[in-house]
């Protein structure tokens, strides 16, 4: 992909406006997870080292536009950046008509979603953002699938528009996996419903050599192959769709599964009741009417791990079982370790996938972990991300 990169630009004395994703959880004024802030720091530091006058902006939460509320202010983020950067980072609440900032200094602009017109990508608001800077840097991959004034609109009007290091790294990794994958390529796509991952499955079926499915998605594929899935979560209306996908790409199905008796499961306390439920390993053809499939069995986990070991590119989206409960997490654990130990280039994305990576402590052995969530899925679906498309146009 051809786009301008912040790292290639001369920023000395330039006013640089950086769109980061600083949407962190805040409870009683305290940031409870700083992962996104830590991810943004290298970009901010790099701009400072290049001699830029740096303005950073982001959204936080889902405020009503034009109705700022203290609990949705970026004030805790300004305090965090002040400490992390070793310089006072002032928070500007009134910035649309200009901001005073010197070279080597960082300021934070208040929550963009306080500004009327932000979500609807109002061109007048986008032009006001653009007027603040000499260079606009888009570095928030997690919001790249949204055409908003601070992500897409500003990039149209800024004198120069470039990708920050975080965004560039995401696009490079996704491009490597989706556009120029080294073969054989294997994708793991798991989740509760085929319907929510249908575009992902269709897109990957045209790229992958093998498509490993898990969770409720695997149950729908098992039903399509004529197996009884008992009381397992599956989508009867998408059985034909599963057959069509399986006709396009190799979809290795589980040969054994881990089940629980559905009568032992309380859906109002799903994980709690699963923790007390008995896990039973069964051949897939032995699943009975009252069984609920909650993980792949050890034989299947080993077979899937062997597929991953011999692949050159792995894209992973979703755990293959209810890994939050240990007796239904062995399949996800085995696949996590197989991805980690494989020599393949691996990219992983999606909230549950990241939680599994954390649980099994394999983050350092995954080639690239996408922070994008919805943007990651839309890229994998083959959709154009508005904030990326404008950077390609401006290149």
Curated annotation (Swiss-Prot):
* Subcellular localization(s) per the UniProt record: Cytoplasm
**UniProt-listed InterPro entries:** Phosphoglycerate_kinase, Phosphoglycerate_kinase_CS, Phosphoglycerate_kinase_N, Phosphoglycerate_kinase_sf
- CC annotations in GO: cytosol
So what does this thing catalyse? (2R)-3-phosphoglycerate + ATP = (2R)-3-phospho-glyceroyl phosphate + ADP
Q: What is its EC number?
A: 2.7.2.3
* Disulfide linkage: none
Q: In Gene Ontology terms, what is a biological process of this protein?
A: glycolytic process
Task: Please verify whether the record's keywords include Nucleotide-binding.
Answer: yes
Gene3D superfamilies xref list: Phosphoglycerate kinase, N-terminal domain
Q: In which pathway does it act?
A: Carbohydrate degradation; glycolysis; pyruvate from D-glyceraldehyde 3-phosphate: step 2/5
An example Gene Ontology molecular-function term: ATP binding
Query: Any idea which positions bind substrate?
Result: 21-23, 36, 59-62, 113, 146
What residues bind ATP, as annotated?
Answer: 197, 324, 350-353
Enzyme's top EC category = transferase
Which UniProt keyword terms apply here?
ATP-binding, Cytoplasm, Glycolysis, Kinase, Nucleotide-binding, Transferase
Recorded hits in SUPFAM superfamilies, A to Z, give: Phosphoglycerate kinase
List the PANTHER family hit by this protein, alphabetically: PHOSPHOGLYCERATE KINASE, PHOSPHOGLYCERATE KINASE 1, CHLOROPLASTIC-RELATED
Q: How does it assemble?
A: Monomer.
Q: Which family does it belong to?
A: Belongs to the phosphoglycerate kinase family.
- What's the protein here called? Phosphoglycerate kinase
From the UniProt record, report the name of the gene that encodes this protein: pgk
């Amino acid at each position: 992909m051809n786009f301008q990169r912040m790292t290639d630009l001369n920023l000395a004395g330039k006013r640089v406006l950086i769109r980061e994703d600083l949407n962190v959880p805040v409870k009683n004024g305290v940031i409870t997870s700083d992962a996104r802030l830590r991810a943004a720091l290298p970009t901010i530091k790099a701009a400072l080292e290049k001699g830029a006058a740096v303005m950073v902006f982001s959204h936080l939460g889902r405020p009503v536009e034009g109705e700022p509320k203290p609990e949705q202010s970026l004030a805790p983020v300004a305090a965090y950046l002040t400490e992390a950067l070793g310089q006072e980072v002032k928070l500007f609440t009134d910035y649309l008509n200009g901001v005073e900032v010197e070279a080597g200094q960082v300021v934070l602009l208040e929550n963009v979603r306080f500004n009327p017109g932000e979500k609807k990508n109002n061109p007048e608001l986008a032009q006001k953002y653009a007027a603040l800077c000499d260079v606009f840097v888009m570095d928030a991959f997690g919001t790249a699938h949204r055409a908003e004034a601070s992500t897409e609109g500003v990039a149209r009007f800024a004198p120069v528009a470039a990708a920050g290091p975080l965004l560039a790294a995401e696009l490079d990794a996704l491009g490597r996996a989706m556009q120029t994958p080294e073969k054989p390529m294997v994708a793991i796509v798991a989740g509760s419903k085929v319907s929510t991952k249908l575009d992902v499955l269709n897109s990957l079926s045209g790229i992958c050599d093998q498509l490993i499915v898990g969770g409720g998605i695997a149950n729908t594929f098992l039903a399509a192959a004529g197996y009884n899935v008992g009381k397992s979560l599956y989508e009867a209306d998408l059985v034909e769709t599963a057959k069509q996908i399986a006709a396009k790409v190799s979809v290795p199905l589980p040969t054994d599964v881990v089940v629980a008796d559905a009568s032992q499961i309380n859906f109002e306390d799903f994980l709690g009741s699963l923790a007390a439920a008995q896990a039973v390993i069964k051949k897939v053809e032995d699943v009975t009417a009252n069984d609920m499939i909650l993980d792949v069995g050890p034989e299947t986990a080993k077979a899937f791990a062997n597929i991953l070991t011999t692949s050159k590119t792995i894209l992973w989206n979703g755990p293959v079982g209810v890994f939050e409960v240990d007796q239904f997490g062995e399949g996800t654990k085995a696949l996590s370790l197989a991805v980690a130990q494989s020599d393949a280039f691996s990219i992983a994305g999606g909230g549950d996938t990241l939680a599994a990576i954390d649980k099994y402590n394999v983050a350092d052995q995954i080639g690239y972990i996408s922070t994008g969530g919805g943007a990651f899925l839309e890229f994998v679906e083959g959709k154009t991300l508005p904030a990326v498309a404008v950077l390609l146009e401006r290149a």
